[in-house]
Swiss-Prot record:
Domain named JmjN: residues: 161-202
Organism (species): Drosophila melanogaster (Fruit fly)
Phenotype upon loss of function: RNAi-mediated knockdown impairs habituation learning.
A cellular-component GO term for this protein: Sin3-type complex
Similarity comment text for this entry: Belongs to the JARID1 histone demethylase family.
Enzyme class, broadest EC rank: oxidoreductase
Chief location category: nucleus
Gene3D superfamilies linked: 2.30.30.1150, ARID DNA-binding domain, Cupin, Zinc/RING finger domain, C3HC4 (zinc finger)
Protein name: Lysine-specific demethylase 5
Low complexity bias: start-end ranges: 45-56, 321-333, 1407-1417, 1576-1595, 1624-1650, 1658-1667, 1674-1683, 1692-1736
Domain JmjC: 591-757
UniProt cross-references to InterPro entries, sorted A to Z: ARID_dom (IPR001606), ARID_dom_sf (IPR036431), JmjC_dom (IPR003347), JmjN (IPR003349), KDM5_C-hel (IPR048615), KDM5A_PHD2 (IPR047970), Lys_sp_deMease-like_dom (IPR013637), Zinc_finger_PHD-type_CS (IPR019786)
GO BP of this protein: behavioral response to ethanol; chromatin organization; chromatin remodeling; circadian behavior; circadian regulation of gene expression; larval somatic muscle development; locomotor rhythm; male germ-line stem cell population maintenance
Modification Phosphothreonine occurs at: T323
Length: 1838
């Protein structure tokens, strides 16, 4: 709402609900006829520039309008208003909301958020002197918020008004933007504008200085219907109060009785008497929505008779009729107290709101000369002023009233009311004094003691005197009669009627008693809202507040009072916006001070008409501010002079608005009058007073369009001309509003003045004066304003001429010029219509102070026309001159207007082009011509023409004539012929000429011609049609931009024609139709053709028959392809193929079936030939036949049978491969089963021989011969390979699979005799499987034999496994290469088995076996039943150079080897290959067993056994006889060739050892490069020339050891016996070594050692010596040099061997020599005595030097050394070969647990020993010489 809008709410205005009667207003601002001064007139228009008025401060109407906004607390306030309540728009919330600045002088805006403004509200006027001052109360509510009532109350929310969001560019010009949106927003009456996010003005009010007195609003008194009810109840209560009783509202059906509704319904039914007579009380109860019950009607009747009927009687005058004077009257007076109910407290609306009429200085009318004494009301009107009917109502005096009342007493049926009727005044006068004395009506003094009813003076004790008029009455004459004298004041019936019917005072808003600061008001407002809703203010939804507001205003029993700080003048308090005159503006504030949207600048813009008014009209061209709280409302109103208004909400909670479009204003006013006729009957101008509100739902139910919006902080709300609007505040907020008037308002402004004249409403300013002022200064006007002013002034001048002419004709001849602009507005208004006069007026000689306008000169007075004088401002000649000045300004507009009239005239032929029309429209926009219907029509015409051009361009009509017929573009849009005709008509009706119109007309002609030709072609039959003619016609139609129906028909016809002729052509040709052609033709026919055409139908039937025949044949052919066909059925297929010739089409599968038949017959012939062969067919031949048969489409039964045979063969082959082939092998099954084609290594790429013989189809005899030949060749090749391998020289030949030099640990294969590196072949445990390692399980041997991977190619299954496979072969009807190979292999194995058994059964061999068994039994007896594992029996004495064999049982390694399979380890003693050059090389003597064997077996038998062993090893089958042979041959000495090969290896290793000058590394066996342990075959120790050697253990001191439980624990090993020591050495070593330091034994060899010493050592257990025999198990190693004495810092002990210089060979003990990969030999004999000594000396010297250098800085070699400290630290040295030192603590040993004869082996050497253990049988290993007792001790130590 506008500034004025809200302000008018607070003006003292006539109360629509104050009473039913009207009276004369006593204020100076009220008219004499009782017409209320409009609320707008309470505002003052100041004449001076500083905004001051000579009178009191200007006051604005009090009508609150805004929408809820975020509550904001100004700086310095303690209230919390920084929250954003629900409903705040995101656009506003995105901007920070700072507090209001503290000091306006220092800072006009807060640094953060600048708050936003809302709408104007009413300003109170002080109560007049002498009036009873109403008691002011703080805002309160009689009832607390009830959620249930709120939800039960039904309120239909009106639709939202439009919301506009201007861009930054659009926001620059507010009036232009408002004009732009006016066409949309004006339909709703209100609109909301959201500024750009960058626009955030500061809040410039000085909050410390701002103090204001708000107005009090009682919400339920605002609503029209509620006010009527309250007024009625107040009259009833007052009536009974004057009767000495208090009114109590009775309860009916547990609800308070609505007395007003009951009274209204009863009156509508004809009154109480008629209702009772017609028995309508039940109907009355129904209409009041009570349940249907007789008792309710009777109850209502009783209440009506008791409460309402006496009131009716008194007010109608019937009560004053004479009654019988009987003192004994038995009538019982009615007592209201008897009815019970709720006490009614009168609202006293007239008393509370007796606000004095505003002084003229407080009005909004302009006072340009400060005439504060001039009255704006009608107080100056003399009593002789002739009242106007319906406006001025006579006010009777009290005497006249009494006289009339007395005269009515004499009329028995007098029903006339003695009350005068009339409109209420604008302001309230002082209430009439109750005790006023009426003039005497009776001269006789006794008359005053006579009853005025019975006219008798007797019964004085019952005589009552009225306290109002002193009349006397008998108590029994009264109706109802009184039983006693009432206490207190008593009024007679006349005074009661007079008092009750006293006219109501004008209704207005009461002024609060206290003054608020902004902070105090905010605290009060927030406290009220929080206490009312019982929740924080920001958590209350706007919908809930809205529904509660309308519930409260419609309730008569809930009193809610709020306060509203409305109409705060910016001239007095400053504006919320920074202004140009503000002091100390911040740099950022200057932009907003000059902004066009600043409400201080907006009304005065160049395009605003209000800028031409010199005076400051507060609230209209000077903004007003409003401080709202929850429920504070502004009532329904529209703006003064129907101007625009703009409202800005600076900050705070939202403001809710409701608006009605200006076009529906009259409908709105009529609805309001119908809803509350009692108010409008006494106050016709009620809507001008801004004191009445009505629920929008009532308006909506009467089809009045209502729109709503919620205005948030930072948002604008615009109201449009004559748009009624109202609203309320959601909470504490601050708003600012002002009016403005753009050029388009000027026409509405004149209509408003005429409307005001009919309503007798005062104007705020003179409209004619404003127009004339602008006409006098046309240069200052914009073109738009000048044009609008010219149009308005032309109308004004025409009207003035007519009025003056009428006045002249009436007879007025005198005239007088007067400058009306110098006269106060209150002195120049028409006495009839209150219009402010400016151009002219009429005065009379009888009263020169009164004037009227020229429309009402006849009602001025009754004098003759000659006495009247015309007062004028301008002559009739001057006004056209003024008009001409405007015309010159608007001359271009006039010319433009004249030309436009001709263009839009439908009867005038147009010659204007579209370009000229667009130029005219552009000229109107550029020169800002005022909006008019002509401009709208012109713009519409231009738009229509542009649309036509656009359509033509989109259709491409103008391109039709320029394109080739064969290069058509698909038109995006096309018109039908009907649309094209209408389009041509539209082009012809345009206001301009468009160049493209000719093309459209030509197109229409071409379209009509095409239609005619198309129709003729469509009538022809298919046989008569020509494709070329149809195609040509279609191309022509496609080139036209027309949607032609005939074009689709032609295209369909063309398809039919093409299809028909194609089908006929295909059928009539010599070749048959293919099935695909038939399908395509039928598909096209079904999809695109019309089957109803006879030609098409006939052709389709023929094609369908052909297709059916082909499908039937194809279906039968498919069966032949799918089913299993036998040979005799092929003839049936051949007959079926012949039937295809009877079909008129080509059968697709004919050729395929014919070819399949041919192939099937050929394949069956080939199978028949194959079956005629004498031998069984090979598998690969059968596979080829099956593959060939699978390519035949026909399923042959013979093929399925052959596939079954082939699958059985493959299954047998898989089973055989599973039995023979190892996992991951690269040998094929055939290669494994056949003899070796070449005795070659695995990596050989030579192609195997003899394999092709098995793949070729040969008879069985030939295959067996080939296999035999392959066997013989295999034996020859193997012998040659063995010879080559044994003749290899380690120094120059290559070994192993990798073809590299002889190095590190080497394994010797017992079959091919080649040497293999440890890391090139699988470990021995991997090959020590059943069937691979032969001879390790019998009682006569403990040493397995090792075969290389090249020699062991398969799993070597036992013969029992092979036999089931051979049985399965008998069931296979086909042959396999593997089949033949397996048969030959089985036959070969059984043949060898027979020969081996024969050889083993000979007497000599049997005797040898018995000797071996006897030896084993003797050894077991000598060992005392000890296990075979780690125990070695003592050897018998032997001669020097003899060969001895010692077998050691398998040993379990629990510490490092996870393999649960027992490993058989063969300990090889050193061969007696002497390194002494002087000693002759002779064959060593054999032991007792060897000698016995040599005696028992002849050379031929031995050779036979060796050949059988080699041939058995070649077999890929495991046989028991191979083990028996191995047990015999392992005891044989090596052959001469083997011995020579071994000697070469030993010599090579000796040279390698001599080349190493540095001591051997101690890091582990894996780091050694000069130590190698190899194993020879069992016959390597034969007497044919092998080198021998002896070895003896060197004595040493014992060392404590135990099982290491730490990370370095190792397997402890005990020695077999304690070697001899020098006397005193052992004790000294044990005593002196506190840290358990020890000295490694020094190993030395003595070439001159004799056999006795050696035998003595062996027998005494102190020396472990053996010969290098053992069936090929002799090995060459690098002997370990003797260890030197080690020193420790704390304690050191040196131990010497007692026989260092006595032995020729160093004994390799398991605790002092390396195994497998270590640098020392393990239990072998080597002819390296001298080198051993040399090595020992070198090592001794080096270790001694190192010990001296390192001294006690040597570190513990444990992986996780704990660095123990203390006086004594115990150490231990490894005996496993690395000779490293360890802290006992670090390896988990305890000194008390170690015995002197224990050895310690570290974790590294333990792993090395484990590796040697796995390699036993083919590599050198540590000899275990522990005695059984000590062995048990070691086990217990573990």
């Amino acid at each position: 709402m506008s500034a004025k809008t809200e302000a008018d709410n607070t003006t003292a205005a006539n109360s629509g609900g104050g009473g039913v009667g009207s009276g004369t207003s006593s204020g100076g601002g009220a008219s004499a006829n009782g017409t209320a001064t409009p609320a707008r007139r309470l505002r003052t228009r100041n004449s001076t520039g500083n905004g001051t008025n000579s009178g009191s401060e200007s006051v604005k109407k009090s009508n609150a309008n805004d929408e809820p906004s975020t509550p904001v607390t100004p700086a310095g306030a303690t209230g919390s208003h920084t929250h954003a309540p629900p409903g705040i728009s995101p656009a506003v919330m995105e901007r920070p909301m700072p507090s209001v600045p503290m000091n306006h002088a220092s800072s006009s805006v807060s640094a953060s958020k600048k708050y936003h403004n809302s709408c104007p509200h009413p300003t109170p006027t002080p109560a007049p002197t002498g009036h009873k001052k109403s008691v002011h109360t703080q805002p309160h509510s009689s009832n607390k918020f009830d959620q249930g009532k709120n939800e039960e109350f039904h309120f239909d929310t009106p639709p939202e008004c439009p919301v506009f969001r201007p861009t930054t560019e659009e926001f620059k010009n507010p009036l232009a933007y408002i004009s732009k949106i006016r066409s949309i927003a004006e339909k709703c009456g209100i609109a909301k504008i959201l500024p750009p996010a960058t626009w955030s003005p500061p809040f410039a009010v000085d909050v410390d200085k701002l103090r204001f007195v708000p107005r009090v609003q009682r919400l339920n008194e605002l609503e029209a219907k509620t006010r009527v009810k309250l007024n009625f109840l107040d009259q009833i209560a007052k009536f009974w109060e004057l009767q000495g009783s208090s009114l109590k509202i009775p309860m009916v059906e547990r609800k308070a009785l609505d007395l007003y509704t009951l009274h209204r319904i009863v009156q509508e039914e004809g009154g109480m008497e008629q209702t009772t007579k017609d028995r309508k009380w039940a109907k009355v109860a129904n209409r009041m929505q009570y349940p249907s019950s007789k008792s309710v009607g009777a109850t209502l009747k009783a209440h009506y008779e008791r409460i309402l009927h006496p009131f009716e009687v008194y007010t109608s005058g019937k009560v004053l009729g004479p009654t019988p004077t009987s003192s004994g009257s038995g009538s019982t007076p009615v007592k209201l107290e008897d009815g019970g109910g709720t006490d009614y407290k009168a609202h006293e609306i007239p008393t509370r709101q007796q606000i004095a009429p505003p002084n003229e200085t407080n009005t909004r009318r302009s006072k340009r000369f400060g005439n504060s004494n001039a009255s704006c009301g009608l107080s100056g009107v003399t009593p002789t002023t002739k009242p106007s009917a319906g406006v001025f109502v006579k006010t009777e005096t009290k005497e006249e009233f009494k006289r009339d009342l007395l005269s009515s007493f004499n009329a028995v049926n007098s029903g006339g009311s003695p009350l005068a009727t009339g409109t209420t005044a604008n302001t309230r006068g002082a209430s009439q004094k109750k005790g006023g004395e009426p003039p005497a009506l009776i001269v006789d003094p006794l008359m005053k003691y006579i009853c005025h009813i019975c006219n008798r003076g007797d019964v004085e004790e019952s005589m009552l005197l009225c306290d109002g008029c002193d009349d006397s009455y008998h108590t029994f004459c009264l109706l109802p009669p009184l039983t006693s004298i009432p206490k207190g004041e008593w009024l007679c019936p006349r005074c009661v009627v007079e008092e009750v019917s006293k006219p109501q005072e004008a209704f207005g808003f009461e002024q609060a008693e206290r003054e608020y600061t902004l902070q105090q008001f905010g605290q009060m407002a927030d406290q009220f809202k929080q206490e009312y809703f019982r929740k924080p203010v920001h958590l209350v939804p706007t919908e809930m507040v809205e529904r509660e507001f309308w519930r409260i205003v419609s309730s008569i029993d809930e009193d809610v009072t709020v306060e509203y700080g409305a109409d705060l003048h910016t001239m007095d308090h400053g504006s919320g916006f920074p202004t140009k005159s503000s002091l100390y503006l911040l740099p950022g504030d200057q932009e907003y001070a000059e902004s066009s949207w600043n409400l201080n600048n907006l009304p005065l813009l160049e395009d605003s008409i209000l800028g031409h008014i010199n005076a400051d009209i507060s609230g209209m061209n000077a903004p007003w501010m409003y401080v709202g709280m929850c429920f504070a409302a502004f009532c329904w109103h529209n703006e003064d002079h129907w101007s625009y208004s703009i409202n800005y909400l600076h900050w705070g909670e939202p403001k809710t608005w409701y608006g009605v479009p200006g076009s529906c204003a009259e409908q709105f006013e009529e609805t309001m009058k119908q809803a509350a006729p009692e108010l409008f009957s006494s106050q016709p101008d009620l809507l001008h007073q801004l004191v009445t509100i009505m629920n929008p739902n009532i308006l909506m139910n009467n089809r009045v369009p209502v729109f709503r919006t919620d205005q948030h902080a930072g948002e604008f709300v615009i109201t449009f001309p004559r748009a009624y609007h109202a609203g309320f505040n959601q909470g504490y907020n601050f708003a600012e509003a002002v009016n403005f008037a753009p050029a388009d308002w000027l026409k509405m402004g004149r209509e408003c003045v005429n409307h005001y004249s009919m309503l007798r409403r005062f104007c705020v300013f003179s409209h004619d004066e404003l127009v004339c002022k602008m006409a006098l200064e046309p240069a200052k006007l914009t073109f738009g304003i000048a044009t609008a002013c010219y149009i308005d002034m032309a109308e004004m001048v025409d009207t003035e001429k007519k009025l003056r002419k009428s006045l002249l004709e009436w007879g007025v001849t005198r005239a007088e010029r007067r400058a009306f602009e110098l006269v106060n507005d209150d002195e120049r208004h028409c006495q009839e219509c209150n219009t402010t006069c400016f151009l002219s007026a009429v005065a009379c000689e009888c009263n020169d102070k009164l004037i009227v306008c020229l429309r009402h000169y006849t009602v001025l007075c009754g004098c003759a026309p000659e006495k009247h004088t015309l007062i004028y401002r301008y002559t009739l000649d001057e006004m056209p001159l003024m008009l001409q000045k405007l015309k010159v300004k608007a001359h271009s507009f006039e010319r433009w207007l004249s030309r436009c009239r001709d263009i839009v005239d439908a009867h005038t032929p147009t010659s204007v082009t579209l370009q000229e029309l667009q130029e005219l429209c552009k000229e109107a926009e550029t020169k800002k011509f005022p909006s008019s219907l002509l401009i709208d029509r012109l713009n519409a015409a231009a738009v229509e023409a542009e649309k036509c051009v656009t359509v033509i361009q989109q259709l491409g009509i103008n391109k039709v004539r320029t394109r080739s017929d064969h290069n058509q573009e698909a038109a995006q849009y096309k018109l039908t012929m009907e649309e094209l005709e209408l389009f041509v008509q539209e082009i012809d009706n345009l206001c301009c000429i468009i160049d493209e119109g000719a093309s459209v007309r030509e197109l229409l002609v071409l379209g009509k011609q095409f239609v005619e030709r198309s129709e003729s072609q469509l009538q022809l039959s298919l046989e008569s049609l020509e494709e070329s003619e149809l195609e040509t016609l279609i191309n022509e139609g496609s080139s036209l931009r027309i949607e032609l129906q005939q074009l689709d028909l032609l295209q369909k016809r063309l398809k039919q024609c093409k299809w028909y002729k194609r089908s006929q052509g295909l059928r009539e040709t010599s070749s048959k139709l293919t099935y695909q052609d038939v399908k395509n033709l039928l598909h096209i026919a079904a999809a695109d053709l019309d089957p109803t055409d006879p030609y098409v139908d006939k052709e389709m039937r023929k094609l369908q028959q052909i297709g059916a025949d082909i499908e039937a044949w194809e279906s039968q052919a498919a069966k032949y392809f799918r089913r299993l066909t036998q040979q005799h059925e092929l003839g049936e297929i051949e007959q079926f193929l012949k039937s295809a010739s009877d079909i008129n089409g080509q059968v697709p599968s004919h050729g395929l079936l014919k070819d399949a038949l041919r192939k099937a017959r050929e394949w069956l012939r080939a199978v028949e030939q194959l079956q005629q062969n004498n031998h069984v067919t090979y598998c690969h031949t059968l596979e080829a036949m099956i593959e060939r048969g699978l390519n035949i489409p026909i399923q042959l039964e013979e093929l399925s049978r052959m596939q079954g045979h082939l699958n059985s063969a493959h299954q047998w082959k898989d089973n055989t491969a599973c039995a023979f082939l190892k996992k991951g092998t690269f040998y094929t099954l055939l290669e494994v089963l056949m003899p070796r084609s070449d005795a070659i290594n695995i990596d050989s790429d030579l192609k195997p021989r003899f394999q092709d013989d098995f793949l070729k189809e040969k008879n069985p005899a030939e295959i067996v011969a080939s296999f035999k030949h392959a066997e013989e060749q295999e034996l020859l090749d193997m012998r040659e390979l063995r010879r080559q391998n044994m003749n290899k020289n380690p120094m120059r030949d290559m070994f192993c699979l990798c073809k590299s030099e002889f190095r590190n640990l080497m394994f010797n294969c017992q079959l091919c005799r080649d040497w293999f590196h440890e890391d090139c072949v699988p470990p021995p445990s991997a090959t020590n499987q059943n069937g691979i390692v032969n001879g390790g399980s019998g009682p006569g041997t403990n040493r397995p034999k090792w075969l290389c991977p090249s020699c062991v190619r398969s799993k070597r299954p036992r013969l029992e496994t092979i036999l089931p496979l051979l049985v399965q072969l008998q069931q296979l009807p086909i042959r396999l290469p593997e089949d033949e190979a397996l048969r030959c292999l089985a036959e070969r194995a059984m043949n060898w088995q027979d020969r081996a058994r024969k050889a083993l059964s000979s007497p000599d061999v049997s005797a040898a076996q018995e000797a071996i068994m006897a030896q084993q039994q003797q050894k077991r007896r000598s060992e005392g039943g000890a296990g075979v594992g780690n125990i070695s029996s003592p050897r018998k004495p032997r001669r020097r150079g003899s060969l001895t064999k010692e077998a050691s049982g398998s040993t379990e390694s629990d510490a490092d080897d996870d393999d649960d399979e027992d490993e058989c380890r063969l300990r090889i003693v050193e061969d007696n290959f002497s390194n002494d050059e002087d000693e002759p090389r002779t064959a060593p003597a054999t032991s007792t067993v060897n000698s016995d064997l040599l005696k028992l077996l002849s050379d031929s038998e031995i050779e036979n056994l060796l050949d059988l062993m080699m041939e058995g090893d070649l077999l890929e089958v495991s046989l028991d006889e191979t083990q028996e042979l191995w047990r015999i041959l392992e005891t044989m000495p090596p052959t001469l060739l083997q011995a020579e090969a071994m000697e070469r290896v030993v010599q090579y290793m000796q040279r390698q050892r001599q080349q190493h000058t540095n001591p051997l590394p101690t890091s582990g066996a894996e780091d050694s490069n000069d130590s190698l342990m190899v194993q020879n075959s069992p016959n390597s120790n034969s007497n044919s020339g092998g080198a021998t050697g002896s070895a003896s253990n060197s004595g040493r001191n014992k060392k404590r050891r135990s099982n290491d439980t730490g990370g370095n624990s190792a397997v402890p090993r005990k020695k077999q016996s304690t070697p001899k020591q020098t006397p005193g050495k052992k004790g000294s070593a044990a005593a002196a070594r506190k840290s358990d330091a020890k000295a490694s034994p020094a190993a030395s060899t003595t070439p001159g050692a004799d056999a006795d010493a050696e035998n003595k050592q062996a027998n005494g257990g102190n020396t472990n010596s053996s010969t290098g025999s053992g069936g090929g198990n002799s090995a060459t190693t690098t002997p370990t040099p003797g260890s030197t004495h080690k020193k420790r810092k704390r304690t050191s002990t040196t131990a010497t061997n007692n026989n260092n210089n006595n032995n020729n060979n160093s004994t390799n003990n398991s605790n002092s020599s390396t195994n497998l990969n270590s640098n020392t030999t393990s239990g072998q004999g080597a002819a390296t005595g001298g080198n051993n000594a040399t090595g020992g000396q070198k090592k001794h010297a080096q270790r001694s030097q190192q010990a001296a250098q390192e001294d006690d800085e040597e570190e513990c070699r444990a992986e996780n050394c704990h660095k123990p400290t203390g006086r004594e630290v115990d150490w231990v040295q490894c005996d496993g070969g690395c000779n490293e030192w360890f802290h006992m603590y670090c390896v988990g040993l305890n000194r008390s647990q170690i015995k002197p004869d224990d050895d310690y082996i570290c974790i590294r050497c333990t792993k090395t020993v484990a590796i040697g253990t796995q390699g036993s049988g083919h590599s050198m290993s540590v000899a275990s010489t522990t005695t059984p007792g000590k062995q048990r001790a070691v086990q217990s130590a573990r």
